Amino acid sequence: MNSITLKPIRYIEGEVNLPGSKSLSNRALLIAALAEGTTRITNLLESDDTRHMLNALKLLGVEYTLSEDRTECTVVGNGGPFHTKEPLELFLGNAGTAMRPLCAALTLGSGTYVLTGEPRMKERPIGHLVDALREAGAKITYLENEGYPPLKIEADGLKGGEVRIDGSISSQFLTALLMAAPMARGDMQIDIVGELVSKPYIDITLHIMKQFGVEVRNENYERFFIKGGQIYQALETFMVEGDASSASYFLAAAAIKGGTVKVTGIGKTSVQGDVAFADVLEKMGAKVEWGDDYVSVSRGELNAVNMDFNHIPDAAMTIATTALFAKGTTTLRNIYNWRVKETDRLHAMAMELRKVGAKVEEGEDYLTITPPVQLKHAAIDTYDDHRMAMCFSLLALDPVSVTINEPECTAKTFPTYFEVLESISSY
């Protein structure tokens, strides 16, 4: 097994240019592929997840050119849904941002498709999306377990109409349906069942659809109306914002052991909800400064928080490890959807925090964390989850070193993460 041991970091200071956002990169690639015209996408994230989307688009006949460093992609739009004569199997790894949106998009055209992925992908639910697509006229079959990939899609277009979708597990299901809805034959009304999680991710989807020429009427995140029979219109250039979830590690590091860290590529006008992570650090006691395209954080005396983190589930993971450096007991509430991510993150986080000496209570949808007087050295298991590896790297900010098992899992969103962290660290 591969592992790296991070030696104790004395001080953090510097500037980080963020890689492109995973959420925006894969949405932009798919919409550009469905659009009429050619779109140049800049600051694209180079990662496993985008690679899976690009491979799928190539198999679907989409033409694109990639720059040498794979951060710029010129996509020749298909001018509407995909039509294929031969049955196609698409392997999507563990990329939820490829699996869910493609599942919806492929129902719009014609052809037979099998969507599959890594073993963990087969444990990640997709039933709420499939139920909604079936209501809109899609023919989708589960090939192994009911409610989970792999799936077989026999595409013949979506009729539209009134569709209900459960919003309580993952916002990606609604994102997938929204992105496909304009190309249904008729108008679509989407009614949300249950409380919609991760609303800021829906804002990302609506923002990108609007840039490609499609308006959605949003009634308080309870009901959405989309006109059918539309085609997305290509953009000359679409610039992908920096990844706000990835920013969280560097900002937290500054709050714990700064100095000041400035991250560029996101700022006060960012469309990503995860920029609110900086507000949480400020609440804990760090000093935060905002610009249009940067956020900077400086060290402060950190105190525990008790908060609902439903709006920023990915960045909230970073708060769980930051809590080890705060005074008091931190409570993260309303984070059930951690359980259906790359791994069961609630359970994984509780297990690994206990290894370093924290007192942890793991509830169905919450976590309480009381830091120990002194952290213990531990070998942290990452569960093939990029965010586990990056969150626990913050433990190097303690005088005790930390070992991260299988650190290469950061390739999912941030292949150069450990090099970038080192570049702003003094030992």
UniProtKB/Swiss-Prot annotation:
GO terms for molecular function: 3-phosphoshikimate 1-carboxyvinyltransferase activity. InterPro entries: Enolpyruvate_Tfrase_dom, Enolpyruvate_Tfrase_sf, EPSP_synthase, EPSP_synthase_CS, RNA3'P_cycl/enolpyr_Trfase_a/b. It catalyses: 3-phosphoshikimate + phosphoenolpyruvate = 5-O-(1-carboxyvinyl)-3-phosphoshikimate + phosphate. Phosphoenolpyruvate binds at residues 22, 96, 124, 172, 345, 387, 412. Its main location: cytoplasm. The keyword ATP-binding does not apply. GO terms for biological process: amino acid biosynthetic process; aromatic amino acid family biosynthetic process; chorismate biosynthetic process. Pfam families: EPSP_synthase (PF00275). It comes from the Bacteria. Its EC number is 2.5.1.19. Keywords: Amino-acid biosynthesis, Aromatic amino acid biosynthesis, Cytoplasm, Transferase. 3-phosphoshikimate binds at residues 22-23, 27, 170-172, 198, 314, 337, 341. Gene3D superfamilies: Enolpyruvate transferase domain (3.65.10.10). Catalyzes the transfer of the enolpyruvyl moiety of phosphoenolpyruvate (PEP) to the 5-hydroxyl of shikimate-3-phosphate (S3P) to produce enolpyruvyl shikimate-3-phosphate and inorganic phosphate. Belongs to the EPSP synthase family. Monomer. This is 3-phosphoshikimate 1-carboxyvinyltransferase. It comes from Sulfurovum sp. (strain NBC37-1).
